[in-house]
A protein has these predicted regions:
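Long, contiguous, secondary-structure-rich segments that constitute the structural scaffold
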Residues: 475, 481-538, 602, 606-622, ...
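Extended redox/cofactor-interaction regions of prokaryotic respiratory oxidoreductases
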Residues: 118-189, 196-203, 226-230, 318-440, ...
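Flexible, glycine-rich terminal cap/loop adjacent to redox cofactors
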Residues: 792-851
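Short beta-alpha connecting loops at secondary-structure transitions
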Residues: 212-220, 447-449, 453, 464-475, ...
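Conserved short loop/turn motifs at secondary-structure junctions
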Residues: 105-113, 272-275, 298-305, 337, ...
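N-terminal export/assembly segments and adjacent metallocofactor-ligating motifs
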Residues: 1-239, 250, 257, 268, ...
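Flexible glycine/proline-enriched surface loops and loop-helix/loop-strand junctions
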Residues: 170, 213-214, 264-267, 296-301, ...
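N-terminal leader/propeptide and maturation segments of large enzyme subunits in energy/redox metabolism
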Residues: 72-77, 239-277, 354-367, 372-376, ...
Length: 851
């Protein structure tokens, strides 16, 4: 048994893991007891990592060799790496020569390692001469970046996880930490248990599990955070709870902010936010008068057209009360992805350069050009995520290179995103998993390595750099992301820099990291004192860690000096602006999207485990019970949900966690799991068919936390329910085969179930009984078409019932192996129970008679 220390590939907590492996198989995973981010703890996602890497799953879900399509929507053909890289470089050069470098677009990921990010950034900006490289971190963290830079001068969270243990007041806003950062939440729970006097305030439109631990819950209206923060500062000023000495010595711009918040009286704020003014007063008092206040925040602030203003307004509170630069205090942005921070460090966004340099700064461009050995870095701003896909949809960007992310699931306004990939002349998808929706749009698929196979580094929310180590070799012909980018770059150099030494002479991930390290010298994130060897010997470290240092830096700004031209933090007087898409009579509900506890992003990894669907088994939209009652919606009935951009059909579920006129749907449900067709027969996408592409003007982050929608009853009198246990060696192939069939119904969802075994559950609804051939295909695909199955068919009524029994375990009794009910699904509940609990089957005879 081999044991390899590495880092979890899920959220930004950055937990250490110990991977157990035998030969080329990962056999187990446990929390690393020595990693300071988690001290051995793991959440449900992290603790099941080894199961997602089982040989059966790898064979069915992974891209194992390069593949190319000769025509769109056609089958792929396996090709060699030499062929793949040759054709990729030729296509990029052709587009570049015909349309210029800005006709190229690179869309990368916060799940890439720092080394991967660095090479891609240098490839785009240094070699090809385009700043059109952005990342899915634009969807989660760019407002936090902009907020920190606007107020504190640098993209650097000033606090650390240990501050939870020192805080006297926790102010959690826009974060369901219990689900999105579970291991950190365990630390919060322990702090509350050890110190009952620790005050905890949670502000969130939903009464989440995190809110359940709060001493004070503020159920504010969606998008009103800036008004709340201005109102808190108004009260602090009125009551004399600010710190004038700190403001005078360490900040600037306070007078303009005082003028702005003068109008945000408790009455006005209570009205805007939908809160009790007494609760607003209490929150202000606890925040300001606590010896140490730590704020924790995430997508509720970031994913907004006011994202930068929200971040800045919260940081204003810390500056006004001196709650920064000391143990237990500070504005602490929780990173969404495992290496969104590392991507920011290397400048892997359209507006950034290496080591927190700004693309708009001529001095910074010159420094990076000198480091990379190029004449210049282009000054033309690059296209950010939403702009990039809109430009491709409009025909401006001709080639897209997508690495380690799934925009056909995760981007807002899916119709535009999919049109972009359809219209682009050339689409490359560099990906570990073959099952993502984006893979269907690729002209060229390049197999990449993933967790358990990669070497490099990541940086978590508290600026802590951890090593990622390989326990096994990548399967098939999969290659490391940085190496794929290097191989591409060297081919491009033969045409763009003939006869000159390569700019990409990297022999390992470490050699890439060393160049990145040098780029940080003298910068706010200086890591010139670090090395792979030091990280091996001393474990994960927090930056800055400059040359000559003996340890990292837990907290920033303890001396009151900030990385701004005058050394002072800057108050930001940003006005309150409502959500971009307000509710209106035609669209009377707010849609909020967010995470589930046991899933991650588009579920290309977590979605292969039936046990991770035990918490939330299938797609639903949640509504307040009173809103459902007014519309005569029944729990579990199908509704059509529509925004100005698209629609979907989904079951409705009552939730008292929500306020009136609010709805919630998990961000994970893409077209891989939730599908159907519209009135014109066009396929329906997942939840992001509904979401808004409107962005924050400063951060360019889209407002995924709010869209105006309508929810209507839909009459689909014909329904289908099918469930079947499937062999581990074929279950994911079966799911892939079912996906195109799902698009032939008005509504369909397909999800795995089971704990020790795995099966698939398919639900569908339609306006009329579909062609019997379609049901035959489903039966065949789920293994229910054998001669031994019990079966009843009534073609005139569009009804069918089928049950496959398994007697292999006990010849004297049988259990359900699978069933299909079409046209009449009244028996679904008890048959589902018999199947999932493996109760000895006693299927009533009338189930297979004409009713």
């Amino acid at each position: 048994m081999k044991h390899t220390r590495s880092t979890c590939p899920y959220c930004g907590v950055g937990c250490g893991v110990v991977i157990e492996s035998q030969g080329q198989h990962i056999t187990g995973v446990r929390g690393d007891p020595e990693h300071p981010a988690n001290w051995g703890r793991l959440c449900t996602k992290g603790s099941t990592l080894a199961l997602t890497a089982s040989p059966h799953i790898q064979q069915q879900t992974r891209l194992l060799h390069p593949q190319m399509r000769t025509q769109r929507q056609g089958a792929t053909q396996a090709i060699s790496w030499e062929q793949a890289l040759d054709v990729a470089s030729q296509k990029l050069l052709d587009v570049m020569h015909r349309h210029g470098p800005d006709a190229l677009g690179f869309y990368v990921s916060g799940q890439l390692l720092t080394e991967d990010y660095y090479v891609f950034n240098k490839l785009a900006k240094g070699l090809l001469g385009t700043n059109n490289i952005d990342t899915n971190s634009r969807l989660c963290m760019s407002s936090a970046v902009a907020g920190y830079k606007l107020t504190l001068g640098a993209d650097a969270p000033p606090a650390c996880y240990e501050d939870v243990d020192h805080a006297q007041c926790l102010f959690i806003v826009g974060s369901n930490t219990a689900w999105a950062h579970p291991v950190l939440f365990r630390r919060i729970e322990e702090a509350k248990a050890a110190r009952p006097d620790l005050k905890m305030v949670v502000a969130d439109p939903r009464r989440t599990e995190t809110a359940g631990l709060a001493d004070l819950f503020l159920p504010l209206q969606p998008g009103t955070d800036v008004a709340l923060f201005h109102g808190l500062l108004h009260i602090m000023l009125w009551e004399g709870w600010t710190q004038p000495d700190f403001i005078a010595q360490h900040t600037s711009g306070f007078e303009a902010l005082k003028t702005l918040v003068r109008d945000f009286t408790p009455d006005k704020v209570a009205d805007i936010c939908g809160l009790r003014k007494e609760d607003v007063f209490t929150a202000a008092q606890w925040f300001a008068t606590s010896p140490a206040t730590l704020s924790l925040y995430c997508q509720g602030l970031n994913q907004s057209t006011s994202g930068t203003a929200k971040n800045a307004a919260l940081i204003n509170l810390h500056l006004a009360t001196g709650q920064i630069g000391k143990p237990g205090a500070g504005p602490f942005s929780l990173t969404g992805q495992p290496n969104a921070m590392g991507g920011r460090e290397v400048g892997g966004m359209a507006n950034l350069l290496s080591a927190h340099r700004d693309l708009a700064n001529p001095k910074h461009r010159a420094e990076v050009a000198a480091l990379w050995g190029v004449d210049h870095v282009p000054e033309q701003p690059g296209k950010t995520a939403v702009d990039m896909f809109e430009a491709a949809a409009d025909g401006q960007i001709k080639a897209l290179w997508i690495a380690c992310t799934n925009p056909a699931q995760s981007m807002p306004h899916q119709s535009t995103v999919r049109r972009a990939m359809e219209r682009a002349e050339w689409v490359v998808v560099q990906e570990a998993f073959a099952s993502t929706a984006t893979c269907a749009y690729a002209d060229l698929l390049l197999p990449a390595s993933t967790w358990g196979e990669k070497e490099g580094t990541v940086t978590n929310s508290e600026r802590r750099i951890s090593r990622v180590r390989a326990a096994i070799e990548p399967p098939g012909q999969a290659r490391h992301d940085w190496y794929i980018a290097v191989q591409l770059a060297q081919r491009l150099e033969q045409h763009l820099r003939p006869g000159q030494p390569s700019l990409f002479q990297y022999s390992s991930a470490e050699s890439v990291w060393l160049e990145h390290r040098e780029s940080t010298r003298g910068r706010d994130l200086d890591i010139t004192g670090l090395s792979y060897e030091l990280l091996e010997q001393q474990g994960p470290q927090q930056w800055p860690f400059a040359s000559g240092s003996t340890q990292g830096t837990a907290r920033l700004y303890q001396d009151g000096v900030f990385p701004t031209p005058d050394g002072r933090a800057q108050f930001a007087a940003k006005p309150y602006v409502a959500v971009a898409e307000k509710r209106e009579p035609k669209y009377p509900f707010s849609l909020n999207t967010g995470r589930l506890r046991d899933h991650w992003h588009g579920m290309s990894r977590t979605g292969v485990l039936g046990r991770l669907f035990g918490h939330v088994p299938e797609p639903v939209i949640q509504m307040h019970p009173q809103d459902m009652a007014r519309r005569n919606f029944i729990e579990g009935s199908l509704v059509r949900v529509s925004s100005k951009r698209g629609s979907l059909v989904v079951p409705v579920q009552a939730s008292a966690e929500l306020g009136l006129s609010q709805t919630f749907m998990a961000m994970h449900w893409g077209s891989e799991y939730l599908s159907g067709q519209d009135a014109q027969g066009m396929p329906l996408g997942g939840v992001n068919a509904l979401t808004s592409p409107e962005v924050c003007p400063s951060s360019h982050q889209p407002e995924l936390k709010h869209a105006a929608i309508k929810v209507e009853a839909i009459d689909l009198p014909w329904s289908l329910m099918a469930m079947a246990w499937l062999p581990a060696s074929s279950v994911w192939q079966v799911q892939s085969q079912l996906r195109p069939l799902m698009n032939r119904f008005d509504f369909a969802s397909c999800v795995p179930f089971g704990r020790e075994r795995t099966g698939l559950m398919l639900r569908a609804g339609h306006a009329h009984a579909p062609d019997a051939v379609l049901i035959d295909e489903i039966e065949q695909t789920l293994g229910l078409a054998s001669n031994t199955a019990l079966r009843y068919v009534d073609p005139q009524r569009g009804q069918r019932r089928c049950a496959q029994l398994d007697t292999s375990l006990d010849s004297n009794s049988s259990v359900l192996q699978g069933f299909l009910l079409a046209g009449d699904t009244q028996s679904a509940a008890w048959m589902s129970t018999m199947l999932t609990q493996q109760i000895p089957a006693q299927v009533p005879a009338q189930t297979f008679r004409r009713q």
